[in-house]
Amino acid sequence: MHKLFKNAPFFDFEAIRILGTTCYGGADVAEVFEAVDQIKNNDPETWETAWRIQAERAEKLAAEALEHGDRDAALAGYLRASNYTRASGYMYVSRAESSGEALVQDARALPIAEKVGELFRKAIPLMKGSVHTLGIPYEEYALPGYLYLPPPWRRIPGRKIPILVNSGGADSCQEELFYLNPAAGPGQGYAVVTFDGPGQGIMLRKYGLEMRPDWEAVTGRVIDFLEEYAAENPHLELDLNCIAVSGASMGGYYALRAAADQRVKACVSIDPFYDMWDFGTAHVSPIFIHAWTSGWISGGFVDNLMALLSRLSFQLRWEISVTGTFFGLSSPSQILLHMKKYTLRSTEEEPEGFLSRVICPVLLSGAGKSLYLDVDNHTRQCYDGLVNVAERNKQLWIPESEGQGSLQAKMGAFRLCNQRTYRFLDECFGIMRKSL
């Protein structure tokens, strides 16, 4: 496939990630190409500048359209402005002020996150369906969320509205998640819920709330909230007997954990990892890993080595920054060891593995050309771990070409991903549609 950045695969993938939202209004083709032309390979500052310019232009166009009563252009402009703003801050790198302390986020990160939400909320009143802004109780916080509802003419006849709860992943925010499930679900008669959980979006940038591996605890509270919300708003006709969960990449791992909740009746897990430690150490010599974990090599040596390699690779520096920020850690060796907590493997407490808790139907996908996760060590192990899901209720989707979804998290193929997602959910919930 054509490369937008020929000698920078990380930048190329992230540019496709932005370009892929074009089908749902998150970008315009020429604007993306214009930005790409201004970015130098592996240069985060030109990346930030190029997308900031496009964001400012899109915001100005949206304001002009709003003033002239052009609803569609205003909606498109605010969506693009929000998405380009998100992209502009994507390559920010957190720093460690001293050894052992948590990383300090780039000072620009919080204002960017707030601007992304502000612009997106300007788009919400212009959407065809109703969107409710939520505050989901979690510890002493309120997780921000959106509930996207189908317009009346897109309701599924003769039944309440089925619900899809989408979990973000390692580096997304709920405004970006719009281009996955919410952009398509209401048109199919589904209500879709997104939220920023611990370690994600504004909850990370503003409050420093760290991620947790037992994501079922988070989605459990989201579902608790939905039960209360549906009871308080019976006119919405939300179907609490038809709740599904979804997510991509790390969000796919989260979706599988969420599916252990018996209130969840279907799960769509897009390109998840099976074990984060395996992912984090996949390209490191097993001999080196054994020497370190056996005590022959110190954590300090690993940290110094990673610091040296980070000077040579912006991608590695960025990856350490992202994981360290949402884990609340600064030491690369501690970050890697912390990844062991994010696993679906069997343990002494759960000999069959966490996935043995899942009994609902599951659509599981892998990415044949993933930049990060190979199919055999992650996708197929997830599939095999679903021992209590009948074979007829497990679907495996592993595309091998980019246009069919072979890039990680189905970047560049969101429309196809949604088509497969909602067809699967229709089957799970007994929804029959007439041919057109």
Swiss-Prot record:
Q: Where is the active site?
A: S249
Ranges that cross the membrane:
none
E.C. number, please? 3.7.1.-
Which top EC class is given?
A: hydrolase
Mind telling me which InterPro entries this protein's record contains?
AB_hydrolase_1, AB_hydrolase_fold, FrsA_esterase
Query: What's the superkingdom here?
Result: Eukaryota
Q: Which GO terms describe its molecular function?
A: hydrolase activity
The record's section on Pfam families has: Abhydrolase_6
Q: Which UniProt keywords apply?
A: Hydrolase
Biochemical pathway: Mycotoxin biosynthesis
Q: What's this chain's function?
A: Hydrolyase; part of the gene cluster that mediates the biosynthesis of a family of the mycotoxins cytochalasins E and K. The hybrid PKS-NRPS synthetase ccsA and the enoyl reductase ccsC are responsible for fusion of phenylalanine with an octaketide backbone and subsequent release of the stable tetramic acid precursor. The polyketide synthase module (PKS) of the PKS-NRPS ccsA is responsible for the synthesis of the octaketide backbone. The downstream nonribosomal peptide synthetase (NRPS) amidates the carboxyl end of the octaketide with a phenylalanine.
The UniProt similarity line reads: Belongs to the AB hydrolase superfamily. FUS2 hydrolase family.
What quaternary arrangement does the UniProt entry report?
Homodimer.
User: What is the protein name stated in its UniProt record?
Assistant: Hydrolyase ccsE
